[in-house]
Structures are given as structure tokens and as C-alpha cells.
């Protein structure tokens, strides 16, 4: 029987499917951070249960860490408690921890892949909604709740209903300067923030194959923003080249066997999806959001949409509410929207490729007057590589702030947050009301678009606003 990529991974991990109950699947990798794990570890302790698979559990500190100092004294009391509690729990259960002093510490969805923890064909879970990032490697990866975190810690399994399948094909090649962020925002703009609800999405097509692993991670990271359970890209030579030699990737004969297995991880030619969506890559322009969800997005050469043009009353009301919150007027050219904050980072866009793209726009220019711009690498490894390439100097000379790794301004959970009324060009994944701070307005863009906005003081079309020549 022909199968999709998702069905192959699902079937390989199905432990039991009791009649009338949710199936139980096996979990290969469990990623843990300081925010959603304390109650789970506490539950184990109270029940006197051991950790089922220490070697398959990996922890880091990212959500509440400071990007200005690696000292615990830089943290708020709540953040310090969470960080210290994670350290205590990892010590008590012998879990591998990448703490704030470890050179590989970073955002869980950045450091996991770069260490080779993320592998094709595996099932990966984490108490974080953007776990879908790891699907870029052909893994089935999704976020879970705290009670499920405890269940996985105790059993290395999870009750899970099987999802429907959706194929999203991006045909042809994108134009110069168009990134994975533009592709995924265009997809969400087409199908809506609930278009993928109930599905595991497989991204395919020439434009997807052309993406680097960094780009594929950006793509899958935002699968949750279209409502999908997970996003996946079938592994290929690009995947294998990225993984070879990484710390937790197979070595020697095991690597050769893994390659043979991974090359079978693709959707069979005659497999049938429950739903299919097609986009033409050449039609995708640089994207940016205008409202309060990722589906409220337009091209940079467009204008703020008018709710009066929307025939669906529910959608129209949502648009009106969003425009009132973000304080924009219908018909305003997107390039006329001024910003005063820029955030380049997050599990969506904080990898080395992202920082290179942003630095290309920043090089030889200066951050506009009245604009504060910060760059937060996604991990210690990314930070070191960027500094070895001199990217930090480019940012600093242009007037950007260069920070330590962490989730930072993606969410108003740490000290990096916006003030009421701030308007931010952000490379993160969510533009909900208050996401980056109470009363803040967020516009989601690619790293190049964010850096270009920082130096211009407003949104610009990077197809015109090109990097300066050396």
C-alpha cells in the first residue's frame, strides 16, 4: 500500500492501537526547557517514578534566559526559579543539560538540529508549540502539554490521534531575495491560520527542495501557524550533508545504514493525500504581516487591506479589530509604515543563514534615528560562527545590539519586550496582540526585510533596497 512520508513515520512508531482508544506511539527524542517541565518532573518525583529513557532526553534553557548576561543575577525572580529548578531536575534525573554557561546552549529548536539530536524518521516532542521545526529533517515533530511531558518522561510513549495528511507544493523557483519566511507567510496567507487544522503537512516542490536546512526549518517552524499538527520535508542529500559529523548523528557503519534507511523516507508516487494545496513560487514577493495573526499578510508592494472589501462578516470583523489594535489605515502602502523596533532572532530565524542575510542589508549602513534593533543568535554555536565571520562587527558598526542566545523578544516572557505603542519588524513567528509586550504591534518579516527596515526606519522592498557593494 502506498504511503505518505507522515504515514511511514507514524506506522514505524505505532506501539499499540487499542479499540476505542487513542493509539500509543513511541518517542525517539524528548526536548525539554525550563518553562513547561517543572510540573512534569515534580509529578515523577511525587509518584516515585524513574525517567524512562535518560539517553533520549535533552534539556536546555532558552525562554527566560537573559540575552544581556549569562549570570543568574540578571534574571527576574520567577525566571531564576525556573532556570534553577530545571538544573535541579536534570541533576536529579541525570538528564543532559545545556545550561546558560554551556557553549551549546540555545533555543531548543536551534541547538537540537545543530547537535544532530534531530534525525530523519524520528518522533520528536517538546513542551513547545514550535517543535514542528524539526520536521524539516523528515521527522514527525510536534509540541505537547505539560501533562504529556510527564507522560513521555515516564514512559517514552504518548497517546496520539492520527492526523490527516496535506500536501503543500510550491512549484518552480522563487525570485532572487525570496526566502523560506516569505514562502511560509504566503502559504498561511493563502490557506489561513486554520487551514492546516487536523493535518500533518508535507511541504514539497522545487522551491522547497532548493531551500537549505535552515530555510526548511523556518518553513516547518511555522506549520503550527497554519493550524497544522506538524510540518515535514522529506530528507535528501541536503539533509544528509547537514547532519554528517554532528555530535549525535550516527557514525561509521551506523551512518551508512542510517543513510540507506533515510533514503526510503519519502512519499510514495501513488500515495494519496487528504488535501492538496499548490502555490507558484515565481508569484511570491517579500511578505509582511499587517494584523494580529500570521494569516493577515500581504506583499511588500501591497497596501493595508480594507475590511469593507471582505464579504465574510466574521473575517471582516476580525480585520477591523486587528486594524484598530495595530493602528493602521486601510489603503496605506506597506512601505509607508514606520517602525521603531527591530528584532532579528527566534526559533524561526536566528540561524547563521538568517544572520548573514540580515548582515548583508546592514553592512555599510546605519540604524535609522529613533529605531532600536537587536540581533539575538539562536545558539552558542551560531553566535561563535557569526563572530568568526565578522557578522557581529557588521551589526555593531551599523548600530544594532548584538546579544547572547535565547528566545528573547519573540515573546514577552523575559526582559526583552516591547512597550505599548511600539511597532516592531520581527523575524519571529507570531504577531498576536501583546505577544511581544502589552500594547505592542508586531509585523512578521524575513531577516533581510527586518534589517532593511531597521536602517530605513520603515518597511522597504528588498528587491529594490539591495545590499551595498563592497
UniProtKB/Swiss-Prot annotation:
One of its GO terms (biological process) is L-leucine biosynthetic process. GO terms for molecular function: 3-isopropylmalate dehydratase activity; 4 iron, 4 sulfur cluster binding; metal ion binding. Binds 1 [4Fe-4S] cluster per subunit. Heterodimer of LeuC and LeuD. PANTHER family: 3-ISOPROPYLMALATE DEHYDRATASE (PTHR43822:SF9), HOMOACONITASE, MITOCHONDRIAL-RELATED (PTHR43822). It comes from the Bacteria. Catalyzes the isomerization between 2-isopropylmalate and 3-isopropylmalate, via the formation of 2-isopropylmaleate. It holds the Pfam family Aconitase. [4Fe-4S] cluster binds at residues 347, 407, 410. Its EC number is 4.2.1.33. Keywords: 4Fe-4S, Amino-acid biosynthesis, Branched-chain amino acid biosynthesis, Iron, Iron-sulfur, Leucine biosynthesis, Lyase, Metal-binding. Pathway: Amino-acid biosynthesis; L-leucine biosynthesis; L-leucine from 3-methyl-2-oxobutanoate: step 2/4. It is an enzyme of class 4 (lyase). Belongs to the aconitase/IPM isomerase family. LeuC type 1 subfamily. HAMAP family: LeuC_type1. PROSITE patterns: ACONITASE_1 (PS00450), ACONITASE_2 (PS01244). It catalyses: (2R,3S)-3-isopropylmalate = (2S)-2-isopropylmalate. InterPro entries: 3-IsopropMal_deHydase_lsu (IPR004430), Acnase/IPM_dHydase_lsu_aba_1/3 (IPR015931), Acoase/IPM_deHydtase_lsu_aba (IPR001030), Aconitase_4Fe-4S_BS (IPR018136), Aconitase_4Fe-4S_dom (IPR036008), IPM_dehydratase_rel_enz (IPR050067), IPMI_cat (IPR033941). This is 3-isopropylmalate dehydratase large subunit. Its cofactor is [4Fe-4S] cluster.
